[in-house]
C-alpha cells in the first residue's frame, strides 16, 4: 500500500470533524484558512464561528469597517491577517465572484501558496498540493529528507514532492489528510510512532532520527524592547490612540507611552504616578516586549499628540487592542479593585467583606473589577 492511500485510509478513521469541512462555501473555507494561520484549531474555531455569525457572507464582511474586523479579531494576534482578510473581501466583492483557481486566489491580499492551494483543492477540487509545517514534517520524516525547509531549494523540493503524491481524484481529502496526520499523529514532539500506519516504511523511524527532522537553517533572532505605558485618567476619561503603519499592531489602540509625554518631561508625570506593574513580558515572533505600566490622574489634561482621543473609561472595551494592552488594562482594573477593597464598608469576623461600588454593596467575588 502506498503513502497516499495509507494517509487517506487513516484520515477516514481519524480525521477531525470541523464545521468548515461540512461546507463547500469558498468564503467559509477561506475564512478558516486565514484564521488558522499561526493559530491552533481549539482557539481558532470560536473565532471562525464568531466571524460567520457577524458576517455570514463575503459581502457582509466587505461592508464592515476595519475597526469592527479588528475588534472581532482581538486576541488572535498577527493582526495583519485581519486587515488583509478585510481587504481581500472587498477585492472579491469588487470583482463580482470568488476566485476559483490557485492562480486567481493568490491575487487576493494575504493569500499565499499554501492558503490558495487549500482553498482551490477543498472548495473547487483543483489538483494542487498544500505545503505547511505539518506537511514539511511528515514528508521530511517519512522520506528522510534533511534539506532545510527554509531555503529556496528546500521549499522547491518539498513542493514538488507534495505535488507528486496528491491523488488527482481526491485532492481535498488528501490535503486535509496530510495536515491532520501531522497535527495528530506525526506531531512535532513525541510523535505517536507506535500507532503510526506508516512507521514500517518511514526512514526517520527506521534510522531513529525523528527528532532531528525537518531541518531549519535559520534561527529567528528576537530583540528585547522596553515599553513604558501610562494610564492617564482625567475626569472619567482615559487617553488612547490608534497605532499607525510602520510598526507592530497597525490599526490597534493603545495607551500613551512615555515618549508621548516628552513635551512635559518624565519627572513631571512620574513623580505623581503610581507604578501598577513592571516588566510584563509579551513574546512576539521577532521581539520580546517588556512593559511597565503607570497610573496617573493629573488635575489638568497633559499635552498629547493630535491623534490621541479621550475616551470615557467605561467604554474602553469597545476598542480593539493587542494582547499586551488587554493584559495591562486588566492590571488597571485589578489595581482599582484592590484599592476599593481597602475601603470595605462593613467587615466583621462573621460577615463576608463588601465594597461600596457605585452606591451598591457587593461581595468581593462579585466585584466588577475582579479579573
Question: Over which residues does each language-model region extend?
Answer:
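Intrinsically disordered, low-complexity, charged terminal extensions of DNA damage-control enzymes
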Residues: 1-16, 22, 183-371
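Catalytic cores of DNA base-excision repair glycosylases
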Residues: 3-194, 198-211, 224
Amino acid at each position: 500500500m502506498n503513502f497516499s492511500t495509507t494517509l487517506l485510509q487513516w484520515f477516514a478513521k481519524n480525521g477531525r470533524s470541523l464545521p468548515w469541512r461540512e461546507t463547500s462555501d469558498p468564503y467559509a473555507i477561506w475564512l478558516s484558512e486565514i484564521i488558522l494561520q499561526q493559530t491552533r484549531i481549539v482557539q481558532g474555531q470560536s473565532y471562525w464561528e464568531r466571524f460567520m455569525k457577524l458576517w455570514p457572507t463575503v459581502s457582509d464582511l466587505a461592508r464592515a469597517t476595519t475597526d469592527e474586523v479588528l475588534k472581532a479579531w482581538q486576541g488572535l494576534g498577527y493582526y495583519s491577517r485581519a486587515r488583509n482578510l478585510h481587504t481581500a473581501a472587498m477585492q472579491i466583492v469588487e470583482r463580482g465572484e470568488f476566485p476559483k483557481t490557485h492562480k486567481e486566489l493568490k491575487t487576493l491580499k494575504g493569500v499565499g501558496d499554501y492558503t490558495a492551494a487549500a482553498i482551490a483543492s477543498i472548495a473547487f477540487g483543483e489538483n494542487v498540493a498544500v505545503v505547511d509545517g505539518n506537511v514539511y514534517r511528515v514528508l521530511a520524516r517519512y522520506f528522510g529528507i534533511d534539506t532545510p525547509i527554509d531555503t529556496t531549494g528546500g521549499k522547491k523540493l518539498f513542493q514538488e514532492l507534495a505535488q507528486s503524491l496528491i491523488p488527482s481524484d481526491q485532492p481535498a481529502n488528501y490535503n486535509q489528510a496530510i495536515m491532520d496526520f501531522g497535527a495528530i499523529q506525526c506531531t512535532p514532539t513525541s510523535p505517536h510512532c507506535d500507532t503510526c500506519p506508516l512507521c514500517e516504511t518511514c526512514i526517520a523511524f527506521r534510522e531513529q532520527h525523528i527528532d532531528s527532522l525537518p531541518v531549519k537553517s535559520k534561527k529567528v533572532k528576537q530583540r528585547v524592547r522596553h515599553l513604558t505605558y501610562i494610564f492617564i485618567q482625567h475626569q472619567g476619561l482615559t487617553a488612547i490612540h490608534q497605532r499607525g503603519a510602520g510598526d507592530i499592531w497597525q490599526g490597534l489602540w493603545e495607551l500613551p507611552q512615555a515618549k508621548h509625554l516628552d513635551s512635559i518631561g518624565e519627572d513631571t508625570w512620574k513623580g505623581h504616578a503610581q507604578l501598577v506593574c513592571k516588566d510584563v513580558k509579551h513574546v512576539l515572533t521577532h521581539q520580546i516586549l517588556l512593559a511597565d505600566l503607570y497610573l496617573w490622574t493629573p488635575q489638568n489634561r497633559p499635552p498629547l499628540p493630535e491623534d490621541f482621543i479621550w475616551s470615557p473609561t467605561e467604554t474602553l472595551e469597545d476598542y480593539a487592542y493587542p494582547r499586551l494592552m488587554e493584559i495591562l488594562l486588566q492590571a488597571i482594573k485589578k489595581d482599582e479593585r484592590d484599592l476599593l477593597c481597602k475601603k470595605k464598608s462593613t467587615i466583621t469576623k462573621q460577615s463576608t467583606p463588601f465594597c461600596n461600588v457605585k452606591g451598591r454593596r457587593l461581595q468581593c467575588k462579585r466585584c466588577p473589577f475582579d479579573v
